[in-house]
Amino acid sequence: YRYFTAEKQESLLFLIVGIIAVILAVVFWFFIKSNPNFFKGAAIPFLAIGLIQMVVGYSVYSRTDKQKADIAYNIGMEPVSYVKQTELPRMKTVMKNFVIYRWVEIAFIITGLVLIFLFRSNADKTFWYGFGIALAIQAVIMLGADYFAEQRGKVYTNELNKITAD
């Protein structure tokens, strides 16, 4: 149960971060008049990744209670076979996806840092400087959130493996 409770809490936080990022993007795009290229550049990653955070946060938050109840019921009915045939394969996929997410997030961080480094002193390229800063910020947030989710997933998977070892 702790795994699903923590998943739900983090997904709510993810949803809130996504909403804040989208609001920032709208403010940056439509309302900031000083250095507009910088803020328009920053708005794009905040909007794109913020929307992803909102969708992922909402979908995980809304499905977690039912998922927790279904899994608890099935483990209660047929612990070993359900865990072996359904829950461990599901978690194997989840854990494999974290590796993909991690590399994408690292690539975004590196891209953001390269853009920051290349365009930090170039007044004609403030769009890309803003883009790089926002991309790096969002990627670090995603990497951090996924790190903690992956750690919870490892603990949960270890608990599932104990059920099949008995």
Predicted feature locations:
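Long, highly hydrophobic alpha-helical transmembrane signal-anchor segments
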Residues: 3-54, 112-122
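Transmembrane helix-loop junctions in multipass membrane proteins, especially transporters and channels
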Residues: 30-37, 62-65, 69, 117-125, ...
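Hydrophobic alpha-helical transmembrane segments of polytopic
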Residues: 17, 42-49, 104-108, 131-138
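Hydrophobic alpha-helical transmembrane segments and immediately flanking/interface helices
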Residues: 107-137
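Cytosolic-side membrane-entry/anchor segment at the start of a transmembrane helix
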Residues: 1-30, 89-98, 144-164
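Helical transmembrane-bundle signal
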Residues: 21-25, 50-60, 109-112, 135-142, ...
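C-terminal halves and exits of single transmembrane alpha-helices
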Residues: 80-109
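Membrane-helix interface/capping segments
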Residues: 58-85
